[in-house]
From Swiss-Prot:
It catalyses: N(2)-acetyl-L-ornithine + H2O = L-ornithine + acetate. PANTHER family: ACETYLORNITHINE DEACETYLASE (PTHR43808:SF1). This is Acetylornithine deacetylase. The gene is argE. Binds 2 Zn(2+) or Co(2+) ions per subunit. It comes from Proteus mirabilis (strain HI4320).
Length: 387
């Protein structure tokens, strides 16, 4: 295709120069509208039809779905447009200026994962898209780094059903077919304050929390014993007590105590089943101390995800790469996209650089990724190879 678009490096540069931070703090949170419009302009130049979708209950966030070709099936290439916030004091260069140094491209979002869109657009230069017999979709989502609101909303409302989807998170071009889910809850105990000289006149929230943690530790052991998937390095669900706060003085009965905890379930352990287990575990404390214990989700839970190893689409990717699909413990948008079609997580860059100061992608990924993008489109969208 003879299309006038910026060079690959210039595509990358403009993506990195367009801030799109997601944060729970409204002061830090940013709209991704400018980045969505940038992508829309490039993709329209390539002949895609563009749909921009406001994502409800967000601070000015949008999804973009770009479609080229018609018919059924096809390929969906997905990525999120947002980045995490950055610690200015720990970066040695401007996070919004693409910096090439010693074979690496530095900048916020170079690996995780705005750069993925540059790879897609650059690969399309060499493909005769007039020969597509199955559609090519490109999805750019919002708020993956916080609530995953964009992917949730898209999956719940779209009518498209591709044959296959790739989410371009940084996996070092290693195909990922499964990951654990994530639930994060606040356990809050409301006691009754009083002078420590007469403990019977108060209700010590720290003691009730100790009782609660004892029950939760029992649940942790049950999960470890009951659920096992040897495909994972850590083959059982994990539970972590990550934050606790309570009390204000040694001579005062603690009135309030709060614990933040998370659970990472294996695929197949549903969020509802896990929520039921959690409340069942804490039921004895609630029964003994009515009205004093509450459980509140810190964010919308993310289910575990798994693409069957024997799916024919997985075999195509494994053959292209010469590598077997693996599992990881971190979370992506895959559970939501998997509801539409078989999905793998596969992209350039290393997860080790994600969310780090001086984030970078090694330039050694450029040619293999560009080649892979072309192969994916040929295999799933072009006449002679579309399945």
């Amino acid at each position: 295709m003879n299309i006038k678009l910026p060079t690959f490096i210039e595509l990358y540069r403009q993506l990195i120069a367009t801030p799109s931070i997601s944060a729970t703090d409204a002061k830090t949170d940013q709209s991704n509208e400018a980045l969505i419009n940038l992508l829309a302009n490039w993709l329209e130049t390539l002949g895609f039809s563009i749909e921009i979708q406001p994502v409800p209950e967000t601070r000015g966030k949008f999804n973009l779905l770009a479609t080229l070709g018609s018919g059924t099936g096809g390929l969906l290439l997905c990525g999120h447009t947002d980045t995490v916030p950055f610690d200015e004091g720990r970066w040695t260069q401007d996070p919004f200026t693409l910096t090439e140094k010693e074979g690496k491209l530095y900048g916020l979002g170079t690996a995780d994962m705005k750069g993925f869109f540059a790879f897609i657009i650059d690969a399309l230069r060499d493909i005769d898209t007039s020969q597509l017999t199955h559609p090519l979709y490109i999805l750019a989502t919002a708020d993956e780094e916080t609530s995953m609101a964009g992917a949730r909303y898209f999956a719940a409302n779209t009518a498209i059903r591709p044959d296959f989807a790739i989410i371009g998170e940084p996996t070092s071009l290693q195909p990922i077919r499964a990951h654990k889910g994530h639930l994060s809850n606040a356990i809050r105990i409301t006691g009754q304050s009083g002078h420590s000289s007469d403990p019977e006149k108060g209700v010590n929230a720290i003691e009730l929390m100790h009782e609660s943690i004892t029950h939760l530790s029992t649940l942790r052991d049950r999960l470890k014993t009951r659920y096992n998937n040897p495909a994972f390095v850590i083959p059982y669900p994990t539970m972590n007590f990550g934050y606790i706060n309570g009390g204000d003085a040694a001579n005062r009965i603690c009135a309030c105590c709060e614990l933040h905890m998370d659970i990472r379930p294996l695929p197949g352990l549903t969020l509802q089943d896990l929520d039921d287990l959690l409340h069942e575990t804490l039921a004895p404390v609630k029964a003994r101390w009515p009205g004093r214990l509450s459980v509140e989700a810190l964010h919308e839970p993310i289910p575990g995800y798994e693409c069957p190893t024997d799916h024919k689409m997985v075999a195509v990717i494994e053959k292209l790469l010469g590598e077997k699909a693996q599992t990881v413990n971190y979370c992506t948008e895959a559970p939501f996209i998997q509801a539409l079609c078989p999905t793998l997580v596969l992209g350039p860059g290393s997860i080790e650089q994600a969310h780090q100061p001086d984030e970078f992608i090694d330039m050694a990924f450029i040619e293999p990724t560009r080649e892979l993008m072309g192969q994916l489109i040929e295999n799933f969208c072009l006449a002679e190879k579309a399945k």
